[in-house]
Amino acid sequence: MTEHNVQRVAIAGFGAIGKVVAEHLDRGIDGLSLAAVSARDTKRAEAAMAGFAHAAPVLSLARLGEFADIVVECAPAALLREIAEPALAAGRTVIVLSCGALVDNFDLVDLARRQGCRILVPTGALLALDAVQAAAVGDISRVHMITRKPPNGLAGAPYLVQNGISVDGLNEAKRVFTGTAREAARGFPANVNVAAALALAGIGPDRTTIEIWADPAVDRNIHRIEVEADAARLMFQIENVPSLENPRTGRLTPLSVVALLKKLSSPLAIGT
């Protein structure tokens, strides 16, 4: 592929997810190149890229769209607008992992429409997202998700802090939340992007219902999803191994981003 046809990729956030994505880009994905990264700790990011074949410059979030055709958001949910808005205004494709934050910043979709560009949400840990999207073309009557996480993967979530709910020293599973996907996204911004992606693929954040459990007996992030539709009844479960660097996210998440990037430049695309 000629240099002219190569799409430049910038990564916003260089932690447990962003670093893995950058490593794959540096090793080589056909049709793509790592153009820039953004990180809170510039020196740490530069040191992490010391072994890269082609180290990328570390820039501010607002400047990523100047250097790239695709901006991958791998940052805390509170930074979504700061990352996505300038990139979309410049007509760039934006890959959003903090899709929980996207639920309450849906005007970004309108901005993408006006600018003729796209926001892409990776499948992440959500098995059968394609099936949910297909079912939504027909009629879906119910979508329910039960999430179980090790207590340390939920510690510090705003909903727990605001409601005085402790997950320390648990000896048995404790249900800490029940409500809609929209409420879950606000209360657990670092924990339940899976719920937001499920809601956006299906019947929306206000009709999708969520339970969240802190369970000391599990060592994985477990998501059980039940979908009732006129075309099918779907029941599936994902047991995602938590990231060593950040237990709030799973190891599958960065790999899903890499798979999406490969799909963008591949002559063959599998899935809806």
Spell out what each predicted region is.
Residues 4-9:
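Extreme N-terminal starter segment of soluble prokaryotic enzymes
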Residues 12, 125-272:
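Active-site-lining helix/loop region of Rossmann-like oxidoreductase modules
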Residues 18-19:
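N-terminal Rossmann-fold NAD(P) dinucleotide-binding loop
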Residues 23, 85-86, 110:
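Alpha-helical segments flanking ligand/cofactor-binding loops in enzyme cores
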Residues 28-49:
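NAD(P)-binding Rossmann-fold cofactor-contacting core
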Residues 59-89, 100-105:
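Beta-loop-alpha module in the N-terminal Rossmann-like domain of NAD(P)-dependent dehydrogenases
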Residues 73, 96-97, 119-123:
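General beta-strand structural signal in soluble alpha/beta enzymes
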Residues 98-118:
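Rossmann-fold NAD(P)-binding glycine/threonine-rich loop
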